[in-house]
A protein has these predicted regions:
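Generic structural signal for beta-strand residues in well-ordered domains
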Residues: 27, 79, 112, 245-247, ...
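Short amphipathic alpha-helical segments and helix-helix/interface helices
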Residues: 22-26, 71, 93, 158-163, ...
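Non-catalytic N-terminal targeting/anchoring module and adjacent flexible stem/linker
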Residues: 213-297
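Small-residue hinge/turn detector
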Residues: 67-79
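Glycosyltransferase-associated regions of secretory-pathway enzymes
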Residues: 1-66, 82-226
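Glycine-centered loop/turn motif at secondary-structure junctions
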Residues: 29, 78, 166, 270-273
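Enrichment for repetitive, rod-forming helical segments
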Residues: 16, 77, 206, 271, ...
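Feature targets compositionally biased, intrinsically disordered low-complexity regions
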Residues: 77-78, 190-192, 201, 243, ...
Length: 297
């Protein structure tokens, strides 16, 4: 069962809403049903149990309350829940919805920590169910248990649930750079893999007033220019050619007119492309390997 083509976003509290960032998610993915949640729509559409409402009311931090609503919405509707401080770069590909998913927060800065910035599930999925079960059976008052909200009911809770699963195949965990290429600690992704969104870390940096005027870093945006390279069917040096290309800055369209074994080799280079680095990050664009002018994923 694939993830429903629904995008959820939520905003509660008195702070100005990062509307431009949120619109970037909505407008970049027009084939998705878009569901915006606020205090009014939550009251009108969500039939939340009294016990769960009591837990939400016990939690003092607005970001923690948002996390608590998030779990309920994902369990009931399924779909893709995207934080309000995420900015879209390219549309979400359909293959992402083949299985429930989230990503790591950052493999270097915070190994094994699951990110809640974008999560996607089928309805009644085991992960939101287990998260809600834990919430109902534990004290989630941050000031009392002296645990920060993100660790108690956000990424920390997602990580605990995921790592406790006997069958982890129920969800796909994508690399952090898919959705969080620039971490709030300063670690930045400099590879050539496809980046779908950036995260502006609004609650961490307390910068929601600035998010709507921020620009996407150049090295994450799709390139404006590219170089077309055709590989004929008599080329026996494909590995040497690709080894040379991976050390160059730029965007290369590889048009295959060669044997199937070479096509297979190019497809296998996905991990190599993800780990590419450059000496001149200001001039970095992305490699795009094409199979008969279609992007290979």
């Amino acid at each position: 069962m694939s993830v429903p083509k629904i995008i959820h976003q939520l905003w509660i509290g008195e702070r100005p809403m990062p509307i431009n960032a949120m619109n970037s998610i909505k407008n970049m993915n027009p084939d998705y049903e878009y569901m915006f949640w606020c205090e009014t729509t939550i009251r009108e559409k969500l039939n939340i149990s009294r016990d769960y409402i009591r837990k939400i009311n016990q939690h003092s931090e607005v970001w923690g309350k948002a996390d608590l609503y998030r779990w309920f919405i994902l369990e009931k509707y399924g779909g893709v829940f995207v934080d309000a401080d995420m900015v879209s770069i390219v549309p979400l590909d359909d293959f992402l919805l083949n299985k429930s998913f989230f990503s790591w927060e950052n493999e270097m800065a915070r190994p094994n920590l699951c990110a809640t910035s974008i999560q996607a599930y089928t309805p009644n999925h085991i992960i939101p169910q287990k998260a809600m079960e834990w919430i109902l059976n534990n004290d989630i008052r941050s000031e009392k248990v002296r645990v920060p909200s993100w660790e108690l009911v956000g990424p920390g809770l997602l990580s605990r649930v995921f790592h406790s699963l006997e069958d982890k195949s129920v969800v796909q965990v994508f690399p952090s750079y898919y959705f969080l290429p620039d971490h709030h600690t300063g670690i930045k992704y400099r590879g050539h893999g496809k980046v779908y969104m950036t995260h502006e870390w609004g609650s961490t940096r307390n910068n929601y007033n600035e998010i709507n005027v921020m620009k996407i870093p150049h090295h994450h945006t799709p390139p404006q220019k590219s170089i077309d390279i055709t590989i004929p069917d008599d080329n026996k040096l494909i590995k040497e050619v690709m080894t040379g290309l991976k050390h160059l800055d730029g965007h290369f369209n590889i048009n295959l007119k060669c044997e199937k074994d070479i096509t297979k080799y190019l497809k296998s280079m996905r991990n190599v492309r993800q780990s590419l680095n450059t000496e001149s990050p200001d001039n970095v664009d992305k490699y795009e390997i094409l199979d008969n002018n279609r992007e290979v994923e």
